[in-house]
Structures are given as C-alpha cells and as structure tokens.
Amino acid sequence: MDKPDLAVLSELELLRLHGSVLAELCRRGVCRTNNNPIADYTEWLISTRLGLRLEGGSKAAYDAVDQNGVRYQIKGRRLTALNGSTQLSAIRNLEAAGFDFLVGVMFNDDYSVAYAFSVPHAIVLTNAKYQEHTNSHLFYLRRSLASESGVRDITTLVAVC
C-alpha cells in the first residue's frame, strides 16, 4: 500500500485523517476508547494473541482474564527517537494485588513490537516506585526484567509481522 504524502496536507486535514483512523480502529474492535490508541491496541493485541477475555472498563485493577481466572493488567508504550522512556502508565492500588500478571509491551516507532514481558505481581511490586503526588506506582518495563525469575518473555507470541 502506498503511503499518503502527509506533507501536503493541512493541519486540519491531518487531524481529520487521525480521527478517521481512530474511528476505523474502533469499528474493527481494536480500540475501545478515543484515548491514546496505543493502550487500546495493546489490550487488543495481547488479548487476541494470548486468548484472554477483555473485561469492561469498570475493572480498575485488571484488563483481561484467562480461562482459569488469572487476571492480567495490560500496558504498552511506544518508543520514539524523541522519547525512549520505558515507563508504563500509572498503576493504582498496587498493594491490593488486583492483578496476577502485568503484561507490558514496548513498541518501536513504527508500532512493531520491540519486546513484551509477562511479569508476576510480586515482581512489579518489588520494582515499582510509589509517587505520592499521583497516589500511584511507576513501573519501568526494562529489558533487564527478562533475567528475573518468573518473568516470561512473550515477544515472539505477540509480535505482528
């Protein structure tokens, strides 16, 4: 497929194109909200590839469950040339153990999967840092997590060609 020449489009045309793309992703069931599409895309990708059932938006502590009732918090982040941070979005009420595993996906700038891990709650709890001003924990999905006992590298399971 040929890429459109975005340089010739006005700012308004670019925003309209962006809106059309989001609407189509929602129509296809990839996006569930009109927020940053990386979060919805990550949830869709992980649930599809791992055979998980996505929960409704009312489940604050987890996003999906497997056939055995194991609860998964799913988070993704896109790495770019301007921002290579591996910090995932805030995790609230971490001590309450509302999920069994955090599945984190780091995407390359082109949205391909750079790496993905399934991380047990205990390891997230040990490695996350509490931030009082947001009343949440910050967790960095670093490649070095792969060496931690219990962390599963699921990159090949979720990578899209």
Per-range role (PLM):
Residues 1-161:
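Nucleic-acid endonuclease domains
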